[in-house]
């Protein structure tokens, strides 16, 4: 196999390495015939970035069916991994990826309008969030100003925290019983 010590492919099979691949087979189990790097391999600048990349991989493995192909999703993934390797703001990268992933899968969150009324989110109001219906006015919850920031992807610290909560709630609602192992690593940081 490709993982054998003497395999001509083994040197190219690195985690998070962009590859041009060719595989063949009739069943779900395919044989890898070609694995060539698309670009120069860059390692992650820190362990927190690497653990974030593991989280991204886990999300994709749990949320995408094995036979599903998506050039748009691949571009989002590749951009996310590239940004993580450059040691940019990890929280920004992860929140953007989660929002993009939900959008590609058809579960895009509407941060601009109130549920049931189609009124714009009011900056002066608070809103509660439900994955099945969206945002509705409430005595407590998320500030409309913060929801606007998330909508524009200009994340303040508060917007990052709110986006993380909203994204997690949405992912767990639509994809029950996710057991994301990489979250355990973040408890150490």
Indicate where each model-derived feature is located.
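Non-catalytic alpha-helical scaffolds and adjoining flexible linkers that form interface surfaces
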Residues: 1-189
């Amino acid at each position: 196999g490709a993982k054998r010590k003497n395999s001509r492919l083994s040197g190219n099979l690195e985690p998070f390495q962009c590859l041009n691949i060719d595989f063949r087979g009739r069943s779900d189990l395919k044989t890898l015939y070609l694995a060539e790097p698309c670009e120069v391999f860059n390692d992650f600048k820190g362990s927190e970035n690497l653990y974030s990349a593991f989280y991204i991989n886990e999300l994709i493995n749990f949320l995408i069916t094995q036979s599903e192909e998506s050039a748009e999703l691949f571009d989002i993934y590749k951009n996310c991994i590239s940004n993580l390797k450059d040691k940019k703001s990890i929280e920004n990268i992860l929140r953007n990826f989660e929002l993009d992933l939900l959008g590609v899968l058809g579960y895009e969150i509407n941060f601009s309008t109130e549920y049931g009324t189609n009124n714009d989110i009011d900056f002066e109001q608070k809103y509660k969030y439900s994955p099945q219906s969206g945002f509705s006015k409430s005595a407590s919850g998320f500030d409309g100003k913060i929801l606007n920031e998330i909508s524009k992807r200009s994340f303040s610290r508060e917007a990052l925290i709110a986006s993380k909560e909203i994204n997690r709630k949405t992912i767990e609602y639509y994809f029950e019983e996710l057991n994301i192992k990489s979250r355990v690593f973040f408890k150490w940081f």
